[in-house]
């Protein structure tokens, strides 16, 4: 399921928010994978990358909590996790961490993917005239905050990459 032109029901919104949760889990898992792949001496030498990866993991956990709170307020049945995971893998999981030339490129891809997802979801909600069982203003505010955090992540990774070029 991709973010369409508009969101037409609580069920569809819940499903899209669940996709966001899985995306955040992917970002966290990939950040953890990269951190674990750093040699011990690299962990000590590159505090900036270590900090970036730690921040990405912490931010993803916070984002998942915010999305879970929104889902809890919806009048919709939960979609099985396995189904959502399959949808995310098909739509957003085309690459693996080792497909990138380094940690920073992969992290940039993760941040950009999450930003694009939230941006598309916000537009789809704004294009919808459906009344959801959660407050629309609150919903959009939370999603805009998540999008802004992802934009900041893109900028942070880009700055680090430019400084190292």
Regions found by a protein language model. Give the residues of each.
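Non-heme di-metal
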Residues: 2-165
């Amino acid at each position: 399921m991709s973010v369409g032109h508009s969101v037409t029901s609580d069920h569809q919104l819940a499903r899209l928010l669940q996709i966001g949760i899985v995306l955040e889990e992917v970002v966290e898992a990939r950040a953890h994978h990269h951190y674990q792949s750093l040699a011990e001496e690299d962990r000590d030498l590159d505090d900036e990358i270590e900090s970036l990866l730690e921040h990405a993991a912490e931010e993803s956990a916070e984002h998942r909590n915010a999305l879970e709170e929104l889902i809890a307020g919806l009048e919709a049945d939960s979609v099985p996790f396995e189904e959502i995971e399959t949808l995310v893998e098909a739509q957003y999981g085309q690459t693996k961490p080792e497909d990138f030339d380094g940690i920073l490129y992969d992290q940039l891809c993760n941040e950009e993917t999450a930003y694009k997802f939230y941006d598309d979801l916000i537009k789809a909600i704004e294009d919808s005239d459906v009344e959801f069982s959660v407050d629309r203003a609150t919903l959009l505010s939370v999603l805009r905050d998540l999008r802004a955090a992802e934009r900041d992540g893109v900028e942070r990774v880009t700055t680090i990459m430019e400084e190292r070029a």
